[in-house]
């Protein structure tokens, strides 16, 4: 047989033996396909041949997920990158959290009759993350939480007498006052009742936005008090600031620390400050910034002053955790036991004093001021 004819017939035979696969342009949802179970990629979707009635057709397809490798943005005390710092701080905390075993104890729970169990379950998820994170340093023999909503006032007053909760209240106030203070009721308080670490939380608010950080925030206060001692009440921004930072990091988890979630939360904290503090920060004057930072001790009192610490102290903590890691922050807390001076504490733990830190911190904080 002629060699050219043999080659032609061989090619024809091969082409007839192969199954016909339609071009990508013919692959679309609802179009006819030939064999059930086969797949075809068209554009950014993978289509599967399925049975629809008596016909074999392509399904709606599944979009291919695009995984973007995280970019490691270099940061330093002289380069507090606005994206790099939140990401690095978050990574440092979550790395520790993921390597921590589940704590071996559960809180004792007292729940008001009007509280919905599903709402409690939401809170416990964030609280358990805080328990696990701080367990190597703070592991009380007993820890109790009290969850209430409007309508549980009488029950809470009785429970207060039973558990000794009145020591956690501001002078002259009752738990009924606390429940009725805000609408909806979402406030919380942490402290020690009859030598037992305790926090009380009102759950009338939905588990959304900043309310997700409340449980981890309050539990961080218990860690601070136990591991750092009472000196924390006399130093600026640490108590509420670090509780704020670990509250939002553990409460919002898992989340993108450069997303609108963090931005919205910081906006709310900034807006809740007194106008004098807002004016100091907006002035972008370094001396006014330093003076304001030094006014943020818990003993100054008042919700507006607490909001200053929530905001600027949270950012200060974020920077320290990003640059020097989680373990160094724990060391910083331990040093508070014997050192009541912020400048000396920073020098002892991080190697620089208060003024130096504030000078480096200020531009990072100013950049977070809402437009």
Feature names for model-found ranges:
Residues 109-121, 200-210, 228-233, 300-307, ...:
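Second-shell loop/turn segments in exported
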Residues 4-13:
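Sec-dependent N-terminal signal peptides
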